[in-house]
Structure formats: C-alpha cells, structure tokens
Amino acid sequence: MSCPPVRVLPVSLAPAQSLGSKDDSLYLDRSGPLDPSKPPLPPPQSTMARGLPINPSFPTRPTSGYHFPLKTAMNPQPAKQGPVFGRQGRGTSARMVTKKPDEDIYLECEPDPVPVLTRSLSSKALIPPVPLPRTSGLPKSVAGYQEARNGAMDGALKAGRRLSASSIAPALSSSVAENGSLLGQPWYSGNCDRQSVERALLHFQKDGAYKVRLSSGPHSSQPFTLAVLLRGRVFNIPIRQLDGGHHYALGREGRNHEELFSSVAAMVQHYTKHPLPLVDGHSGNRGLTYLRFPTKP
C-alpha cells in the first residue's frame, strides 16, 4: 500500500514593516482621542537623551495626541506663550523667578541695610533742615518792626527777671538775718514743723502758751508763724514781712488797721503786755489772750 503524496502548503509571510509603520505610530503618535482612564505610556529610555530623539525616524514635532516637551527644551527664550510642562520647563521657570529685578535689589540690600538707609535718608531725615530766617519773605519795614518788637519784649522779660530777683533777694536776706537774731529767743524754734509745735502747746494745756516757727509754705512775704493756744485750740497766725524786711505785721492782708513792728522780737514783746485778739475761723468766736508762756517742743 503506497502512501499518499504530502502536499506542502504555501507559507505566506507578512511583509516587513519599517520603523515608521502603523505599529510604531500607535506607540509614538496617537492621533485619536486618549482614554481618560488610561494614562499614556512613557517613552522608551533608549530613544531619549536629554530630551532629544536619537532615532532619525522620530517625529520632529509632537502631534496633537502626544505631548512631548521637545520644542520647549530647544527654545531658550522665556516661556510667555502658556504653561510649560516637563522637567526642563520647570527649571526654566525657576531660573526666571530668581532673576526678577525687584528680588535682586532686595537680596543686595539685605546684608547691609544701614548704608542703604543712610544713602536714602541722609539728605532728609538724618540731617536736620536748616531753619530759614523769619524775615526772609517780608519787606524791610515789617522785618525791622518785628526785630524791634522782639528786642523790646526780650528786654522787658530780662528787666522783669532782674526786678523780681532784686525784690526777692533783700527779703530772703532780711529773713535769714532775722532768723539769726531769733535763735537765742526761748519762744523761737527754727527747726520744728507745725505738727510738733501744736503737740507741744496742747501738751502744755495753758491759755497764752505760744511759739514762733518758720512758715510751712514757701512764702517769702510770710517767713514766720505765731502759734498761740486758747481754750484748747491752737491758732496759727502768719507774720508778714513788709518793706523788704524793715517792718513786720501780724495777721493776713486786708485789715483796715494793723500795727507795724521793726522786728519779730518787738512784736512778741508788745503782745506780752497788750491783749491779742483771736477769731475762730470755723465758729466765728472771738477771744483775747496775752503771750504768757513761751513753750519749747
């Protein structure tokens, strides 16, 4: 029995496709719409070197389906045409931010702010402006009048100061001299205040007890005070100085009749022999007493 002859079927081979065929275009260039759920595949590492294609059949510009930063990487100018994607685009934008003029000036001024402040404010704030003369914009007649008036006012002020000083100086000197003459008197106490004198008189408890002390207030016209005890109450009567210390009077000003004395000692001597009228300022009661008991604290 003979075997049937073997039939050799013809083998059909697919024609060879070049690098830019349809299969390659599916990987490199997708002209159709992209599926939003599937991200595009990254390009192979063998076909890229610093963002430039090595294969000569690589498309020279990206198509609408595949976004590749080829044109941005080859263009050195700053991107002003829209947002730039890719690593090279980000580096370019960062370099542009650090080269802004305002930030350069700030970085230069930051290490040494004092010289900048001195240069910017030396002509205005650090050097005070020179005041202009008041009579620069006035006529000569008005300027002369103002100068004469200012000179007259200054002279009057100086004269007033001299007058006040000359009127106070004799009073102070006379009160100091009178104070020196009173130091030996048993009824005078130059180093006691009002409270200590009143305590001493109240402790003595006799009408007519008295004491002369320095006044509490800074009154040059009332350097001394006479303290007298009457009916359990202490009366403080000012001793006024008149005529630059040449005369002394007892009581406040405004009295119709007052007796003048040449010294405080003469006044005390007079009221040891003559009654001294006293008026209570709170109740208005009047009383008479003599200066009988000089008291020391």
Swiss-Prot record:
Pfam families according to UniProt:
SH2 (PF00017)
Q: Where is this region: Disordered?
A: 1-61, 74-93
GO CC annotation:
cytoplasm
SUPFAM superfamilies attached to this UniProt entry: SH2 domain
Q: Where is the SH2 domain?
A: 187-295
Which keywords does the record carry? SH2 domain
Q: Which PANTHER family match?
A: SH2 DOMAIN CONTAINING PROTEIN (PTHR14098), SH2 DOMAIN-CONTAINING PROTEIN 6 (PTHR14098:SF16)
> What protein name is recorded for this chain?
SH2 domain-containing protein 6
Q: What is the lineage of its organism?
A: Eukaryota, Metazoa, Chordata, Craniata, Vertebrata
